[in-house]
């Protein structure tokens, strides 16, 4: 089984690729929020195992902050609705992470 540290490294690498890609597509925004949600889930499971760090220099957020981050990641249902085209999206709209 892959360790939490290896999974966290993989998510961080994917996030860096998203940042460096600098695309203006909705798909990139959806991928970004999915990775943020996965990162927050890894924080949660690491806390459940009693860890305070995932990678040598990466401290885990406190539990109260972790709960706040999980609440923020729930906004992904809007992105999923956009993906399923149940929300109207104007043609030619630029989506950025900025």
From Swiss-Prot:
This is Probable protein E3. InterPro entries: PPV_E2_N, Regulatory_protein_E2_N, Regulatory_protein_E2_N_1. Keywords: Early protein. GO terms for biological process: regulation of DNA replication; regulation of DNA-templated transcription; viral process. The keyword Nucleotidyltransferase does not apply. SUPFAM superfamilies: E2 regulatory, transactivation domain. It comes from Bos taurus papillomavirus 4.
């Amino acid at each position: 089984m892959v360790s939490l540290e290896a999974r966290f490294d993989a998510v961080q690498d994917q996030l860096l690729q998203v940042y460096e890609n600098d695309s203006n597509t909705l798909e990139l925004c959806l991928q970004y929020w999915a990775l943020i949600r996965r990162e927050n889930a890894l924080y949660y499971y690491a806390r459940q195992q009693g860890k305070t760090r995932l990678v040598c220099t990466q401290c885990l957020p406190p539990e109260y902050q972790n709960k706040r981050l999980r609440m923020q990641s729930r906004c992904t249902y809007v992105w999923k609705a956009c993906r399923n085209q149940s929300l109207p999206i104007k043609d030619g709209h630029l989506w950025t992470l900025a």
